[in-house]
Amino acid sequence: MDKEVLEILLKANNKYLCELFQYTNQKYFECYIDDNKEGMNYYKEIFDSIGEELRKRNYWSY
């Protein structure tokens, strides 16, 4: 994902970020099951960034 796009996404509200975190985490595990390492790396980078932003905000309500 383009870094600029990711930076924009990280400015989203907490609820949207949580939903996006869950979605990218699910996609990561789908790639894991399919042994798609490129996909795993792609989604891991995104959900790690989102998770870090949510931790900064101290917001983990699902």
Predicted regions and their residues:
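N-terminal acidic leader/helix
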Residues: 1-32, 55-62
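Repeat-associated, polar segments at repeat-unit boundaries in modular proteins
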Residues: 50-53
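Short, charged, amphipathic alpha-helical segments
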Residues: 37-48
